[in-house]
Amino acid sequence: MSFKLWREGRSFSYSWKGTKEVPAIKPNCGIKVLYEPHNPIVDLVFVHGITGHRDHTWSADRNSDPWPKLMLPSRIPEARILTFGYDASVIGFWRSISRNSIGDHSNNLLSALSSFRSNAELRPIIFIAHSLGGLVVKDALLSSRASPEPHLRRILDCVRALLFLGTPHYGADLADIGQRLVKLAGLTTAKTNRKIIGVLQRDSEVLFRIQKGFQELLRSQQKDGTRTLEITCCYEELPLMGMSEIVPSESAVLHGYPAIGIHADHRGIARFASADDPGFVSVLGELRRWIGQVVPTDDELEKEVGAVKRKRSNNRWANRKRGGKSCGDTGAITIWGNVTRSVITNGDQIIQGNLVFGGSRA
């Protein structure tokens, strides 16, 4: 990678060519909705990687919309599509950059997602993560598991599947590239984030902690007989600018889980220009398969009933404290959940099960 490329503020996951104009930087932090159907049954959450952007990482061209926004709504209309952004810059010549660690970014993801889903706390989640974003997602799930806060623990309970795109589970050459950039920056006044670079080293203690904790999480799910996570790992088949693969398959693939090779380099593995792209076809196939499995189980419906009862009880108590009527006094019908497996409240009555609207069965 050239000094000129990084001096001009180019994103690792955007472009390695040093001849294009640099567009104005768009907002990148937090959650952004790319598509929201009337009655979603699942949240797809996209998380970019090192020096990435919540829009540009997923865009075949800098001036185009992200492919999840362009190509998924017509093919997976029942899914809400979200993208999460964070400052994962390694070096900044003309601007300040975040000094956040992986743990900071993962906690921000967990908190932002929990807050954003406050009205849909039980909706299933599928993560699609590129590069470093996969480590952020895994660490967020570990934080969710260990959190004393119910609303944060609930995130892990809702996660159904993880799709990793070039995630360096066991380290990557990204670290070597980053170290060279940091040394280069030492000759200038550039700002650097060594915390991000350090985690990508193959002997990184942080990387070891995340991977060890994640494997323990998967084993505990299998041992407890709870719903286990569906996982697919995609790896790059092409080198980047004549180099070796940035994240080779032996680092990008978790042992014992399905692996898919995508005929692209580390940048292109997250960008699809058309619906005919073989990489997109593979990713779409996995998403459709998982979404077909997200219909709530009986145990999950029982949990949903409990959540509805608690919410109704809290609302009734708050209304009576204010001297008003409770929700149960209105006689109105409220539907919680999706039309396939739902929970309906009518006054003090709660109905759960399969619902066929416009038919004779409820």
Where do the model's predicted regions map?
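Short coil/turn segments at secondary-structure boundaries
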Residues: H56-R62, W94-S98, D139-S143, L174-R180, ...
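Conserved alpha/beta-hydrolase
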Residues: S74-V90
